[in-house]
Amino acid sequence: MAVLYGSQTGNAEEVAEDLHRQIERMARRKEINVDATSVSAMNDFDPATLPLQKFVVFVTSTTGQGDPPDNMKAFWRFLLRRSLPLRTSLALTNFAVFGLGDSSYPKYNVVARKLYRRLEDLGGNPLVGLTSSLGDDQNPNGGYFAALDLWTDQLFHKLREACGGIGNGGHEPTAGAIDVDESKIVVERAERPEARASQFDLSKEIALCHRVLRATLGNQGQASAHAPVDSGDSDGGSKERPFFAQLRGNEMLTAPSHAQDVRAVSFDLHPRMCYSPGDVLGILPSQRGDLVAEFLARIGAREDEWVRLRCRKDGGSSGTSQDVIHLGTLFTHCLDCTSAAPRKYFFQIASFFTGVEDAMEREKLAELGSREGRDDLHQYCTRERRSLLECLQDFPSVSLPLEWVIQLCPKLQPRLFSISSACRDASEAENDRQSDRGAPIGGGVRCELTVAVVRYKTPWKREIEGLCSNYLRDLGVGSSVPVWVESGTLDFDHLLGPQPEESSASLGGEREACAILIGPGTGIAPFKSLVEHLVSAAEGGERARTMKILVFFGCRSRGKDYLHRSFWEECVRGSEIFASPGGFAAAFSRDQRGEVLTRASDGSVESRALGRAPAVDLPSYSTTNKFYVQDAIDACSKEVYDVMHLRRGSVYVAGSTGQMPRDVRAALAKVMVRHHGMGESEADEYIRRMEATKRYQVEAWG
């Protein structure tokens, strides 16, 4: 039996690991009869052996525009091969799929749905129906766990029936009933290697820590265990061997009196680290040194210690690692001990490592690690964002061995930021009249991000700071930051490629290189990159006269958080792509108004005030007097109709998940009702067709 996962941030991996542990316990207790079980990322499993598996359990999330996670993509491509015979390839294989999704996203659980149907097409026999296999983060009764608990009960019941075992009704053991596992690794203290005694190369030490973790603990949400570590010489770097970029600028974009600090953070990249509009910059943040030192003291370790990790028999990877790693590097750059909340398994294991006199702590830990304590765990850990350090402080009797600390500590996840500048080398930046930051130092490539510094209070009024945004906020010019370039989820190819010779304004005609860009707050970042590129590329050419770009930006107040205001005003003044029906519209929610800037035929900028429609004509999605981007779309509906329908332009939306993408979609559908005479269902279907042909794309984040 195999348990396989596709996981981008670690949640699907955690579910898969937990399922595997429960299945192994069932096998040890003779509740089911299986020869062997395994758990791995899908990319680390040989798909050609899938027909040999009697039972396979899949757990997957959905990323981007309905894309599979990185550690599932190769496996998924194999399953899509046309050479695989339908209805017979997996005729002897029983499968179950569980999807981790969020119904506030347009592509809710689409990867799990596609995987389920493809396995069925290949002849696989489903153990649990599709409708019971979809978890939703938006479920008020425990998020995706509400569906996972019921799905697990059904799965285990089917396994007992198929494998001839008898058990406890398919329920996870209650609090205190879980037997302790052996750790996957053994940790040995070591001396600092002589070869590294004279020079400490942080980039190499980080790469080595990642390699050792993969070799001993398996994939753990990082790159494939079988993939070579990047040398650092590739154009964009990599997660395991990032390029250390120099911080060039760290400028506050918002007024000091504004509630949120938003910054323009710029870097000098390697000369070969080119990027395109829509790409993202991956950043590996460092944890605060004082908190890491506090954590190491709590577990009885020191920052300057060196250790050797090896696999325990039958645990982790089949090989062993003899590489010695630095504990300070491991817990500062690779494992997240000060920000991410530990998983349920931490509490299960921690309950076995309390003092004999601390029965209350032991019972509470066991409860938090059980199904019965899942709601308490959600409140204590997830909603309150308690880190591993804080959990250990709350339970002072816990004394975990170092091997368990390393195994249970969440992996430090890189953060991805949309790049908000166009790619320019030193000579281009020097001559760019729009650049107020000059050329990169040393002939590199300039890269700018628009970063909102995350600070908020939990339901219990605890102050929380986002790890990466606050890390960037505190950096001084000249600091080195580990980064790499990745492709984003927004596809701008038809805007960046050659203009079609002929275009049709009919519904069925070829779309023109026109677009509507909707980016409230820092969602404007990828569109600033795109516009900066287009303005430069189209300047003085025929394309500038035929391409039309209509931008919608939203913020709270014109005088406090109008991000990159001078850039947008200069672009409208200097480029014909902002001539009508193009333009730049800004909605100021707390000012309860907006404005739209358009380039006039004489090169001047025309400004038109935007306000809410009369109360009798309030859009259905407007419930307050605030003026949002959807209200600006409503006020500019004629221009929106021209670009979106008559010119068959594309629509791109970026920003926070939740209500905004839904309200924007409703506003665009209303445009078709108003100007094309469609009914509401017709307009909804029109937007759906745009989504299917990638004319409507959404990049949203929580």
PLM features per residue range, with description:
Residues 1-702:
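FNR-like FAD-binding dehydrogenase module
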